[in-house]
Design a protein with these regions (language model features):
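Membrane-embedded transmembrane alpha-helical bundles that form the catalytic cores
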Residues: 1-366, 370, 376-414
Length: 415
C-alpha cells in the first residue's frame, strides 16, 4: 500500500451509519401488499441505491485526487452487499426486521476485507449460523490453512519477484524478465485473492455460513469470458444480476448488448479503483468479451489447446494494465514485452536467469495449483492423512514466514 496519512474518520462508524440508513430505507417497500404505487417504490429504491453508490464513488475518486486519503477497508464489498440487499427487498417485498441480523450480514467479518460478496438470501438460508460443530470446524480449519499457504508461501513470495522488477525499473529489464514478471503477477494476484477467499470460506464454515465459491480454476479457461465466470465469481454474478440483466442483457439486439457489456466492464474497472488504468483495464476486457461474443468465440471452441494458449497469453497482458498505475509506465512495460522497435531482449540479458533461479519453487507450485486436476485432487482428498500432514507443514511454515517477513496485506483489501 502507499504511504498514507490517516484522516480523522472512524470507518466503523461509517459502516454503522450505512447499516442504519439501509434499515430505514427498507421501510417504503417492505411489503409488496402495501398500498404503495410501483412508481413510488422505484423512487425509493433509486434513492437507496444512490445513497450507497455515492459513498463508494466519493471514496474511489477521493483516493485518486487526494493521495493521503485512506479507503475504508472493504467499502467496495459491503457497499455491493448493501445494494444487493436493497434490490432483493424491492423485488421480493421481504425485509429483515432484525437490525442485529442485518448488521451481522453486512459486517460479516470473514468477508469484510475482500469478500466474497454474499447475498442476504444465502445467509438467511444458513440454518445453523452461529452454531458450533466440531466436524465443520475441522473442515473449516483445513480451508483456512490452505488459503494461508496460498497467500504466504505463493502470493507473497511471487510478489517479491514483481517488486524486484519494479525496483530494477521497467526501462532496464529484458523481454524474458518482462514476461516472467507478467506471469508472476498473474499468479500473485490469483493466489492472494483465492487464498483470502478460502480463509473466508473456512471461517464461514466454522460459524455455520454456506461455503460460497469465489474461484473455479480460472486459468483453465478457454476464453476471457469464461475466465471471468470463474474469477471472482460473486462479483461477476453481482454485475450480471443487478446491472447487466436490468440494462436488458442480450435481449435488445446486438448494439444494445455491446453497450451493456462495455458499460458493465467499465463499472467493473471503476469498482477496483478510480485510477485511469483500472478503467482502461475494464474497457479492454469489455472489448475482448465483445470480440469473443461476435467473432472469435466459435473458433475458440474448436481447439482446446489454442484456446488455452490464447487465455494464458491475453490475461497476463491485461493484468499488466491493472497493476501499473500510469499510462507512460504501461507503455514502457509493453515495449519490453514486445520489443519490435527497441532493444528489448538485449537490455540486461542476465536478469531473467537470476530471477527465475530465485523463485523456481514458487513458480512450479503456482503452476501446479493452476492445473484443475491437481487442485481438485487436493480438495477431494483433504481428509487423507497425507494431505492433513502436508497442511500441518504448510501451516507452520507459513507461520515461520510471517514471523520473519514484512507485513503483506491482502491485495484486494485496497479495493
Amino acid at each position: 500500500m502507499r504511504g498514507l496519512r490517516r484522516k480523522n474518520i472512524n470507518w466503523s462508524e461509517l459502516q454503522l451509519f450505512e447499516e442504519t440508513v439501509d434499515q430505514r430505507k427498507e421501510e417504503p417497500y417492505r411489503n409488496t401488499a402495501s398500498p404503495q404505487t410501483v412508481k413510488k417504490r422505484k423512487f425509493w429504491l433509486a434513492v437507496s441505491v444512490l445513497c450507497n453508490a455515492s459513498l463508494l464513488i466519493f471514496f474511489k475518486l477521493s483516493n485518486v485526487f487526494e493521495e493521503n486519503m485512506l479507503l475504508p477497508v472493504g467499502i467496495s464489498f459491503y457497499t455491493f452487499k448493501s445494494i444487493s440487499y436493497l434490490i432483493d427487498v424491492y423485488r421480493s417485498g421481504h425485509a429483515e426486521r432484525s437490525f442485529l441480523r442485518f448488521g451481522a450480514y453486512l459486517c460479516c467479518f470473514p468477508q469484510i476485507v475482500s469478500g466474497p460478496i454474499m447475498r442476504y438470501g444465502e445467509m438467511e438460508q444458513a440454518q445453523q449460523f452461529g452454531v458450533w460443530k466440531a466436524a465443520r470446524a475441522e473442515d473449516g480449519l483445513k480451508y483456512i490453512i490452505a488459503g494461508l499457504g496460498m497467500k504466504v508461501l505463493l502470493a507473497d513470495r511471487l510478489g517479491f519477484l514483481w517488486n524486484d522488477i519494479q525496483t530494477i525499473g521497467f526501462e532496464s529489464i529484458s523481454t524474458p524478465l518482462a514476461w516472467l514478471g507478467a506471469a508472476a503477477y498473474s499468479m500473485e494476484l490469483y493466489f492472494d485473492f483465492a487464498g483470502y477467499s478460502l480463509i473466508a470460506v473456512g471461517i464461514g464454515r466454522m460459524i455455520g455460513l454456506p461455503a460460497i465459491k469465489n474461484f473455479d480454476q480460472p486459468y483453465s479457461s478457454r476464453s476471457v469470458s469464461e475466465f471471468y465466470r470463474r474469477w471472482h465469481m460473486t462479483l461477476g454474478s453481482w454485475f450480471r444480476d443487478y446491472l447487466y440483466i436490468p440494462l436488458g442483457g442480450n435481449r435488445k439486439g446486438t448494439l444494445r448488448t455491446v453497450f451493456n457489456l462495455l458499460l458493465v466492464w467499465a463499472v467493473t474497472g471503476f469498482w477496483h479503483g478510480g485510477g485511469l488504468h483500472f478503467i482502461l483495464w475494464g474497457m479492454i476486457l469489455g472489448l475482448l468479451v465483445v470480440i469473443e461474443k461476435l467473432w472469435i468465440g466459435k473458433w475458440l471452441k474448436k481447439s482446446k489447446i489454442l484456446s488455452h494458449v490464447y487465455v494464458l497469453f491475453v490475461i497476463p497482458l491485461t493484468w499488466m494494465v491493472f497493476a501499473i498505475p500510469t499510462l507512460p509506465e504501461i507503455g514502457v512495460y509493453f515495449a519490453r514485452l514486445f520489443p519490435f522497435f527497441g532493444v528489448g531482449s538485449a537490455v540486461n540479458p542476465g536478469d531473467f536467469a537470476k530471477e527465475l533461479t530465485l523463485f523456481i519453487p514458487e513458480l512450479v507450485g503456482g503452476i501446479l495449483l493452476c492445473i484443475p486436476q491437481v487442485y481438485r485432487w487436493c480438495e477431494k482428498h483433504r481428509k487423507n492423512v497425507i494431505v492433513v500432514a502436508a497442511l500441518f507443514v504448510v501451516f507452520w511454515y507459513s507461520v515461520y514466514r510471517m514471523a520473519n517477513a514484512a507485513n503483506n496485506p491482502f491485495m484486494y483489501a485496497n479495493f
